[in-house]
Design a protein with these regions (language model features):
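Hydrophobic N-terminal alpha-helices or hydrophobic patches in metabolic proteins across all domains
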Residues: 2-210
Length: 210
């Protein structure tokens, strides 16, 4: 008769004996979340600086609609060529977007990555955060476009020059970038970068056959 496997065999690294590896992982994620959210909040100006650079390139197809993209802390300001009124010299419209609203998936990804305790976790963390930057930029730009094309009023919206179908697309992009991408995309990126960990977790939690 074959000898039984040693206790804890097949469990992911760091999983304690006598406790479900999945339960331990979930608990570790919960413990990491406050830490990663605090760090994310503190370093958000640096993260938004990267988003600002990407956004400045991404708005180029809109021509002279956006004159420049500026930053104050974690808030990005899109300085446009649109006039707030009909009077000459009345200034231009500037739209502020809070980048924190679209980047809170980053600390979630960090908590999952650090809880998995993979040997290359710091490399995976950097890769994952970098992969999330374009999606954060998408949400920020969709918010900006929603403001100038829909919520800014007919005078400003008419200057922006978007058609009715384009405004519908902007509204959809805004909803998608606000409700779906900040939570779903980090989870997808984590799954893609941690397939080996998930395979080990599945093997460790599989019920042995009789």
């Amino acid at each position: 008769m074959d000898a039984p496997p040693p206790p804890g065999a097949g469990t992911p690294a760091g999983a304690p004996r006598g406790r479900s590896p999945l339960a331990r992982f979930v608990l570790t994620v919960i413990l990491w979340l406050p830490v990663t959210f605090v760090v994310w909040y503190l370093v958000s100006p640096a993260l938004m600086w990267v988003v600002k650079l990407v956004a400045a390139v991404a708005v180029m197809p809109f021509g002279d609609l956006v004159r420049t993209v500026e930053q104050t802390g974690s808030t990005l300001q899109f300085v446009t060529s649109l006039k707030p009124g009909q009077a000459a010299g009345a200034g231009v419209v500037s739209v502020s977007v809070d980048g924190l609203l679209y980047s809170f998936g980053m600390p979630m990804f960090a908590a999952l990555t650090l809880s998995a305790r993979e040997q290359a976790r710091w490399k995976l963390l950097v890769i994952g955060i970098a992969a999330l930057v374009p999606f954060v930029t998408f949400g920020v730009i969709a918010d900006f476009l929603k403001n100038v094309a829909i919520t800014a009023g007919p005078l400003v919206a008419s200057q922006a020059g978007f058609s009715a179908p384009q405004r519908e697309m902007i509204a959809f992009a805004y909803q998608f970038g606000t409700l779906i991408m900040p939570t779903v995309v980090p989870a997808v990126v984590w799954v893609v970068t941690h397939r080996a960990f998930l395979e080990r977790m599945r093997g460790a939690t599989r019920t042995p056959s009789a």
